[in-house]
Amino acid sequence: MAATGVDKDRPRAMTSTTYLGLLLVGIQVLGFVAAIHAVLTVRTAQGAIAWATSLVFMPYLTLLPYLVFGRSRFDAYIEARRQANREMHLAAAELDWRPWVEEALAARQVSGYKGLKALVRMTRTPTLANNRVRLLVNGEASFEAMFKAISAARQVILVQFFIVRDDALGQRLQQLLLERAANGVEVFFLYDAIGSHALPHRYVERLRQGGVQMHGFSTGSGMLNRFQVNFRNHRKVVVVDGECGFVGGHNVGVEYLGEKPPLAPWRDTHMELRGPAVACLQESFAEDWYWATHSLPPLILPPQYDSEGALCQVVASGPADAQETCSLFFVEMINAAHERVWITSPYFVPDEAVMAALRLAVLRGVDVRLLIPSRPDHRTVYAASSLYALEAIRAGVKVFRYQPGFLHQKVVLVDRDTAAVGSANLDNRSFRLNFEVMVVTVDEGFAGEVEAMLEADFAESLEFTPEDRRSVRRLQQLGMRVARLVSPIL
């Protein structure tokens, strides 16, 4: 009987072993298929080699991370963009678009535009003249301007942020939107589902019950898209009545007002935009809204434009683009510099193209400056940024660390007439994984304001010198290099 019991158990053990073997073979096959996919789709040779090798030899460890981090294009968004563009074209057919054409033609005559011709082809948006722009330094000025515009809204409010918090600032925004919705204003509120993961459901429900159309931007539509949590909508946009728009680095939370240690005071920059280019901000928002809801917000053009003003171009970028628009944007701005290029970013994890552009600018005799934080909000990213900063110093770039608090602004200044403000960081995440938006302005007056702002920031910063580079301990350098290994997904 004992032998009979053993005989009964033996097939069961063999069956379990067979299933385990089939599972391992299946994972190995999936790893091989994913490796082929990586070779065909990953945009950089280094990334393709790294993913393909690990997927072939360690599929049990790397298959799931590849589904999350490895895919560099948000394919489902591409089709949503096409459909949104078709519907926007129909909606815009009855509007008078002649000012767009007239301003685009006028823009080509501006001298500062000549060095940035590639931007138009990269972004699908025209370069438009006769815009009014205003620099908004730090949170108090930025939110005061945004809240004032929202309070005066008559028709439509578009709101988009990466992070929204249910704190004093978030509740103030909530109350303003509820008041405008109660007065018949259409309000559309888009937030990133991952960036705002801590936002309580009650915050969203109160707005919805008050008539605000509020949705989270998520990649969860479709089987494979559920794994694409690495793609985030990092844009910060507010548009009121199609007349004025706001873009920059601020999210909605009291830390952006400098009220949350240990990173306080918080250093950030926004800008206000009025004129034809606001329509491009509406288009960017509409594409994102269509992905989240399969519907479009109203498109509004003001009855007339100013007869003079600044040249502006909205540069919206993301993983749905055919090329790395954000990386190319920075390369184009750096290459356009003849006298100087000053860049400020909370993170400095550049790709090879941007590093090469910085080196070439130094060799051309351009004053190349980089302003980064002296305090980390993400230690791994900070370590990787520090290593790249050391390499930049070796190439002749002047690197400064902002001392008073955390520096979060994303600003580029080129020569005496060109500046850009927006949401894009100087890192791989913004280059290839995030949806970002920058506004390029060609105007000597605005560039002068940006220059004065950055000069004040440099005055409160310490330059990172070659002596500092030599004083970094070997253990610290090892940590920096380990951080750089994972920089493609930071």
Swiss-Prot record:
Its EC number is 2.7.8.-. This is Cardiolipin synthase A. Residues 229-256, 403-430 form the PLD phosphodiesterase domain. It comes from Pseudomonas aeruginosa (strain ATCC 15692 / DSM 22644 / CIP 104116 / JCM 14847 / LMG 12228 / 1C / PRS 101 / PAO1). PANTHER family: CARDIOLIPIN SYNTHASE, PHOSPHOLIPASE D. Catalyzes the reversible phosphatidyl group transfer from one phosphatidylglycerol molecule to another to form cardiolipin (CL) (diphosphatidylglycerol) and glycerol. It catalyses: 2 a 1,2-diacyl-sn-glycero-3-phospho-(1'-sn-glycerol) = a cardiolipin + glycerol. GO terms for molecular function: cardiolipin synthase activity. GO terms for biological process: cardiolipin biosynthetic process. Coiled coil: none annotated. The active site is at H234, K236, D241, H408, K410, D415. The keyword Secreted does not apply.
